[in-house]
Amino acid sequence: AAAVPMLLGLSISGVSMVGSDTGGFQEDASAQLFARWFSFSAFTPYFRSHSADDTRPHEPWSFGKNVLDISRHYLRLRYSLIPYIYSAFYRAETEAEPVMKPLFFEWPQDKRLAEVNDEYLFGPHLLAAPVTSPDTLWRHVYLPQGTWYDFWDDTLYHGSSDYLVAAPIEKLPLFVRAGSILPNETARMHTDAERSPVLFLDVYPDENGQACGELYCDAEEGWGYRRGEYSLISFTFQAGSLEVTCENEGFTPPWNDLEVRVHEGIPAAADAADPEEAFTAD
């Protein structure tokens, strides 16, 4: 539980490349702890699994098929989001914008957020709410101002409100800010592997039907980007149309095709004012 506020503190102190040793290196992680830890770490800037000589094996497959499947799922998701994450690091490099930041950093006027240290923004558009307690199937979240999409099923939530959301072992509560465009690609085995030719843009319109996002890409090695050898592309979605603007064209993007996926959103069934109505139990 301490990992989230620790990483957020480092992030706003100017250290953007932060992460935790997934699985730990003291004592033995349980299958449940490792699965939760792995899903959380997939949404941190620095992501790696860890073990030690005097602990049980902490490789994902050492905890059984269920944990292995969960680990594979989040690893693939992480790799598919490389264009989004890499673009967030561009802002960290040029503007000292934290890749992972506490919510009060973005909404300082919301006094509730001064007490929230277990949710955070990952990049400009994703809000992660990791599960840090054992044997948990539901998770309380407070969503800041605006409208939010559930990343997994496109349920819409109104901000400045509390919710109780389902959080089974395989699900990290994850939300997308309305008005966002997420660039992503087909997951690869490793970052040196050949890319799929298709760049995906997932569009999450706000209440006015608008959304925006950006994509940064370069050679991913060397210092050429400091000589202008990079591409910076902005996307604007409005009235059902997408506008693409190249702000810098010093590098040829590695994708040949563009596929746009517009998310419509499904209104949440539960009343935000009474999170207990989010579920019933016999």
Residue ranges with predicted function:
Residues 46, 104, 234-236, 250, ...:
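Intrinsic disorder/low-structure terminal segments
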Residues 1-170, 177, 221:
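Catalytic-domain carbohydrate-binding cleft regions of carbohydrate-active enzymes
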Residues 87, 150, 158, 164, ...:
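Compositionally biased, intrinsically disordered low-complexity regions enriched in proline and serine
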Residues 171-274:
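Accessory, solvent-exposed terminal regions and/or long lumenal/extracellular loops of proteins
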Residues 273-281:
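Compositionally biased, non-globular sequence tracts
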